[in-house]
């Protein structure tokens, strides 16, 4: 608990009945609240570029997602991990995409997606917690920074951010104007409960205003009608995964004229120590959900023309070892892969200073060697897309990074 919250609770002790009523009030705001359609300070205006960051937590196997099938050492280095249930989706003579990434492959073909391979952080150890802290903070060592690079970037651009989560992730922390949104697990409040809250809040202008705003936002939400539809009236077909649902909602928020300029989504489950060779195993299933979510994001933004002004960056905290382990999975590594997509991306290509897969070419004889600093990718996107000055990128967004030159990955 936040110490300030503890002080407030101690100062205003609550009876059980009062606690229940405040719990009910939380249910109202949780189930009513949605992204505002009115103009907000810091909100992006019509025609403003949008940025989406997708964090794959757990350490994506870059050679599984984007296999280097043309590398002469690929088959021997990967063993059973180099065999796929369906042919990999070839991108160029050296690289392909996992057969689960059908939509992403189509975007590469349409020159709306690019693959950055052998990419990674300055951090070279294999701890999830430390690597994710470096990934999100933008530092070179774990815990040297307590705010996030995207939060600092939004301060520099004066823009609003959104986390599709119940809390603000480290990458967005700082002094930026950031909201959060996540699907409510609570039922919609009854009319009687809302009426009781209105009476209780009548003497408190701030609470009364907040309740009315939540009700209005719920009514204005792009998906309010769909959310309220009975189960029997929902679209046919299997229930979409959580990432697909969040991607659709993110697209709606970003497409609004006064929506956020940047949004962050997360997917867990990429720590694939076992069962990677299974066509329905964790890697293949995760990539399918990622692929469907990215397609949903594109479809939602394309409808209003916002896709042409959007850049999506997909990253993970580290890659995995090149060789298979004893449980047909992979262990923590270093070098990995990042994906860029969107109408603003100069796609149709693989960006890689390829180090090779022979044992002597690997980092510590185990991992894909990092030849591209992930900060170069991020600095290129932030500079070209959000128009953040080089001096801010070098000193504030990614401190002491002047030697890391930005990659030009977006359309001119």
Where are these regions (language model features)?
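Histidine-centered active-site microenvironments of extracellular/periplasmic hydrolases
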Residues: 316-349
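Conserved H-loop
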Residues: 307
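Feature for exported/extracytoplasmic and membrane-associated proteins, marking the mature portion
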Residues: 2-51, 55-304, 323, 337-340, ...
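Short, conserved beta-strand edge motifs with alternating hydrophobic and charged residues
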Residues: 263-266, 311-315
């Amino acid at each position: 608990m936040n110490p300030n919250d503890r002080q407030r609770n101690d100062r205003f002790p609550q009876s059980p009945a009062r606690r229940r009523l405040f719990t009910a009030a939380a249910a109202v705001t949780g189930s009513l609240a949605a992204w505002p359609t009115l103009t907000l300070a810091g909100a992006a205006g019509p025609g403003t570029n949008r940025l989406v960051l997708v964090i794959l937590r757990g350490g994506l196997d870059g050679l599984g997602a984007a296999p280097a099938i043309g590398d002469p050492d690929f088959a021997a280095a990967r063993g059973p991990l180099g065999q796929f249930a369906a042919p990999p989706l070839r991108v160029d003579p050296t690289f392909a995409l996992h057969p689960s990434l059908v939509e992403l492959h189509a975007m590469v073909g349409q020159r709306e997606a690019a693959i950055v391979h052998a990419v990674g952080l300055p951090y070279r150890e294999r701890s999830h917690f430390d690597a994710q802290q470096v990934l999100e903070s933008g530092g070179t060592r774990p815990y040297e920074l307590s705010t996030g690079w995207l939060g600092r970037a939004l301060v520099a651009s004066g823009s609003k951010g959104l986390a599709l989560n119940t809390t603000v992730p480290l990458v967005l922390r700082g002094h930026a104007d950031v909201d959060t949104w996540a699907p409510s697990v609570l039922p919609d409040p009854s009319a009687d409960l809302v009426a009781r809250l209105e009476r209780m809040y009548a003497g408190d202008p701030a609470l009364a205003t907040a309740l009315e705003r939540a009700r209005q936002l719920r009514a204005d939400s792009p998906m309010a009608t769909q959310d309220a539809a009975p189960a029997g009236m929902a679209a046919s077909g299997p229930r979409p995964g959580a990432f697909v649902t969040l991607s659709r909602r993110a697209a709606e928020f970003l497409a609004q004229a006064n929506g956020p300029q940047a949004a962050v989504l997360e997917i867990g489950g990429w720590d694939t120590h076992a069962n990677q060779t299974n066509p329905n195993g964790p890697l293949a299933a995760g990539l399918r959900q990622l692929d469907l979510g990215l397609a949903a994001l594109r479809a939602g933004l394309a409808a209003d023309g916002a896709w042409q002004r959007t850049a999506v960056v997909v990253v993970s905290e580290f890659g995995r070892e090149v060789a298979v382990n004893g449980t047909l999975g992979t262990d923590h590594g270093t070098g990995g892969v990042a994906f860029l997509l969107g109408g603003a991306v100069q796609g149709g290509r693989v960006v890689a200073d390829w180090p090779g897969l022979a044992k002597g070419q690997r980092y510590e004889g185990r991992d894909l060697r990092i030849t591209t600093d992930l900060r170069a990718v991020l600095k290129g996107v932030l500079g070209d897309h959000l128009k953040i000055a080089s001096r801010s990128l070098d000193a504030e967004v990614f401190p002491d990074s002047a030697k890391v030159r930005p990659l030009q990955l977006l359309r001119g």
